[in-house]
Amino acid sequence: VATRARAQSDDKSHHACVYCFARPSHRYLELDAGVDFDRQIIVKINVADALRKDLARPSWSREHVALGTNTDPYQRAEGRYRLMPGIIRALADSGTPLSILTKGSLLRRDLPLLAEARKQAPVDLALSIAIADDELQQAIEPGTPTTQARLATVTAAAEAGFDVAVFMMPILPFLTDSEEHLDAALGRIKAAGATSVTYTALHLRPGVKEWYAQWLHAHRPDLVGRYRDLYGDGAYAPKEYRRWLAARIKPLIAAHGLERTPEDPNTGTVASRANARDDEGEWRRTRAYGDDAPAPRAEPLTLF
């Protein structure tokens, strides 16, 4: 991905998504990756001032800055602290391209500001919408806005003139990977006004796997054995599953007209997210410059 830097206004997430890959980073604050991650939110109240200082450095060459690559910039705490407007203004004033990925419908508050920022620097917006089943969505993403609220945010952003991408991440094996679910989700996303969809299968790194396994035992014990087969010895679903998923979802994405345009309209170059896919067409996250959490140990876990 053509992204060098990441800015965050807070650490950890009131969204409490069971599958969140950022959970292990809470351990570096001497907090756990489960309940503490969901309830103990660290707010960086001076983030806009600190960012302006960084952007003023002679060494800063206006690389693309991604907001929302680790934890969500528009979770509930943002409604109180209003940190994102200062971040957006700082980036725009310096001519720094920015992108925002969020589950938060609070993004709508800042659409006028983002429209103004786009006059000074490229702005890329994306909503994370992975689950079309409302009951499942509230069970596994209990602190997030509903799927319909996020789709309404897609519509609002599109009406404000943005090309809005949707990240269907993660696709949950045996829960959201059926053709019926995928087709219904893509239909709603298209109707909302999104222009493209990017997807990936569930990734269970150490620290996340334990929490997800606990949820699975409580809510879907019938799937424990099947998850053991997929994730018992590693963090990623086997290549065979990912290839199967690609063969199922890519034709559906194309049928709904949601394939990502290979050229970025802001720069005239290949879109960065188009470069961020593996051989099976899945999105792969690259480590952003400035990430403060070291990579977890690659050790097998047998929790399912």
Positions of predicted regions on the chain:
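Active-site glycine- and acidic-residue-rich loops that bind
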Residues: 105-108, 172-183
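Auxiliary Fe-S-binding modules of radical SAM enzymes
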Residues: 177-304
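Short beta-strand segments at enzyme active-site cores
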Residues: 66, 101, 164-168, 197-201
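Surface-exposed amphipathic alpha-helices with a cationic face
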Residues: 115-118, 154-159, 250, 254
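A structural motif
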Residues: 95-96, 162, 194
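Conserved Radical SAM active-site core
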Residues: 1-11, 18-126, 130-138, 147, ...
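Conserved strand-turn element in the central/C-terminal portion of the radical SAM core barrel
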Residues: 132-134, 141-143, 156-178, 202-204
